[in-house]
């Protein structure tokens, strides 16, 4: 992982505020998602990823190593349930929130390793200050694994358990993001809201996708998980099926604002992309953007 010289197109991505501004003692995190009736709550004392039963450990939604970057003051967390109920407001350190949802081996060995591996890359992006950070395929996989883990944990914040169980199990078994998942990375500014600087935000939306061809249709569970940590944005699209159904296309506009991490498409990529997600309204605008897919399986026939 290295940096290349700043180019004129990098001017719009000046990241100096990433360190200079975000060291305020008062910060604001938002987590929101829609609940899906398809997913029942995981039984208590069952590990989110491996399914082991027994005592569970608390897992930070965002790693506590972030406090070493200066984010240690008073904070506010807002949890917005997708069922229309009132937002839940919590006070506490910006990156101190834990969820007791994983077993000891998953938390202290497997997930801890992911956090440790991703930390230098994330820190380099936080400190980019207008330069571009090079990510080879090994770095892309490291960030994709970390992003999928983080999105799955964040989705459990109100205990509605919306994240598809098959994808959690596949992730644990293969140690890679699931086959029917696409992960992209982008950049956005840190909003200043009424409660303070919004250091992080995450959204999870379960949906139903439908492929229609020659008058026939196939519907299947689909989801989008998007989150921003400081100035780095991850967008995760996935569907649950036993065969390849669709190739998700972000569209030409988003291709300039999102770089592919998983599955890898390029030996090297440079973050940030040429276009900031600020132009579409950050994470809220991203989750509202349409999703286009090319069918890979013809209903009633062969793919």
Where are the regions a protein language model picked out?
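Generic structural signal of hydrophobic/aromatic residues within well-ordered alpha-helices
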Residues: 19, 76, 106, 114, ...
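Catalytic cores of phosphodiester-bond-cleaving enzymes
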Residues: 32-40, 90-159
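Short C-terminal domain-edge/linker segments immediately following a structured domain
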Residues: 79-80, 132-137, 266-268
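C-terminal, charged low-complexity interaction regions
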Residues: 6-10, 164-303
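Intrinsically disordered, low-complexity boundary segments flanking structured domains
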Residues: 44, 48, 134, 220-221
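An N-terminal structural lobe/cap that precedes and organizes the functional/catalytic core
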Residues: 11-113
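Low-complexity, polar-biased intrinsically disordered regions enriched in Pro/Ser/Thr/Gly
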Residues: 80-89, 130, 200-212
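Serine residues within intrinsically disordered or low-complexity segments
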Residues: 2-3, 7-9, 17
């Amino acid at each position: 992982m290295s940096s290349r010289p700043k180019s004129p197109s990098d001017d719009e991505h000046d990241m100096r505020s990433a360190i200079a501004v975000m060291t305020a003692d008062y910060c604001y995190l938002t987590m929101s998602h829609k609940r899906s009736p398809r997913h029942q709550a995981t039984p208590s004392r069952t590990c989110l990823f491996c399914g082991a039963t027994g005592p569970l450990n608390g897992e930070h939604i965002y790693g506590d190593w972030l406090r070493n970057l200066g984010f240690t003051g008073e904070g506010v967390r807002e949890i917005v349930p997708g069922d229309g109920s009132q937002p839940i407001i919590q006070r506490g350190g910006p990156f101190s929130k834990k969820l007791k949802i994983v077993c000891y081996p998953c938390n202290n060995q497997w997930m801890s390793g992911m956090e440790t591996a991703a930390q230098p890359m994330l820190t380099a992006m936080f400190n980019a200050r207008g330069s571009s950070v090079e990510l080879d395929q090994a770095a892309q996989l490291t960030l994709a694994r970390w992003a999928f883990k983080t999105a799955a944990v964040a989705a459990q914040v109100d205990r509605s358990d919306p994240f598809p169980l098959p994808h959690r199990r596949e992730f644990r078994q293969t140690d890679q993001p699931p086959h029917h998942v696409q992960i992209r990375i982008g950049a956005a500014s840190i909003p200043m809201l009424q409660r303070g600087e919004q250091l992080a935000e995450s959204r999870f939306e379960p949906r139903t996708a439908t492929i229609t061809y020659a008058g026939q249709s196939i519907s299947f569970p689909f989801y989008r998980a998007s989150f921003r940590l400081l100035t780095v944005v991850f967008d995760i699209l996935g569907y649950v099926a036993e065969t390849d159904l669709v190739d998700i296309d972000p569209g030409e506009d988003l291709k300039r604002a999102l770089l592919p991490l998983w599955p890898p498409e390029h030996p090297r990529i440079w973050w940030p992309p040429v276009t900031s997600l600020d132009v579409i309204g950050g994470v809220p605008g991203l989750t509202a953007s349409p999703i286009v897919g090319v069918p890979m399986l013809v209903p009633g026939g062969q793919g």
